[in-house]
Amino acid sequence: MAPNRGASSSKQSNKSASKKSSSSSTLASKSRVSKSSANKNAKRPPPKEVKTKARTEKALQKKTKKREYTEKELNLPALNMITPVGVQKPRGKKKGKVFVDDQESMMTILAMVNAEKEGQIESKIMKARQMEEIREARRKEAEARQEQRKFKYEETKELLKRKRKNGGKEQQAKKDNDQSTTPPKKPNKKRVAFA
């Protein structure tokens, strides 16, 4: 809400506001009348009829022909053709590979390359065999170690079983044997020497 300025000032402002509103209302009514009268005087063109074509018309049923491109324009490779990598040339550039016209020299080169590849394959096979032998040897060593452990384990088991069965008999017999074989020792007398 707006702050109140006082009773006298509000009365004056109301009077001036009423004068302004009455003058503005007459102007507004005139402008309203003039606009509406202008609209009545202006003639509108009659509405045009828009004719729609039936969908069954032949022109709509016909499909527009699209342009068909040839294989050369699309730069498509020929189908069912296996071309070696060296033969394929990139567009607009020369390939740096030169092929031999003589068939025999071509075959010798091929034989050399194949021999190298076979050698590599053979070396891989040899390495695989060596690795397999190493694995087999390690496996055997591990098995031997496990057998030794089992053997030691079984021995200790047997020893413990024997000790349990015999109990204190063996220990007492050993003590008796030790005492009978060695004469009893005399206790050493302590001597003190004066300088």
Curated annotation (Swiss-Prot):
Tell me where the transmembrane regions lie.
none
Question: Locations of Basic and acidic residues compositional bias?
Answer: 46-60, 136-159, 167-178
One of the protein's GO biological processes: mRNA transport
Report biased composition (Basic residues) as residue ranges: 186-195
User: What GO CC annotations are associated with the protein?
Assistant: nucleolus; preribosome, large subunit precursor
Q: Where is this region: Disordered?
A: 1-74, 136-195
Tell me where it resides. Answer: Nucleus, Nucleolus
GO MF entries: mRNA binding
Keyword field:
Coiled coil, mRNA transport, Nucleus, Ribosome biogenesis, Transport
Coiled-coil ranges per UniProt: 124-166
Compositionally biased, Low complexity: which spans? 7-40
**What InterPro entries is this protein classified in?**
Loc1
Oligomer status and interactors: Component of the 66S pre-ribosomal particle.
Give the family this protein belongs to, as stated in its UniProt record. Belongs to the LOC1 family.
Q: Which purpose does this protein serve, as stated in its record?
A: Required for efficient assembly and nuclear export of the 60S ribosomal subunit.
Descriptive protein name: 60S ribosomal subunit assembly/export protein LOC1
Biological source species: Coccidioides immitis (strain RS) (Valley fever fungus)
* Gene giving rise to this polypeptide: LOC1
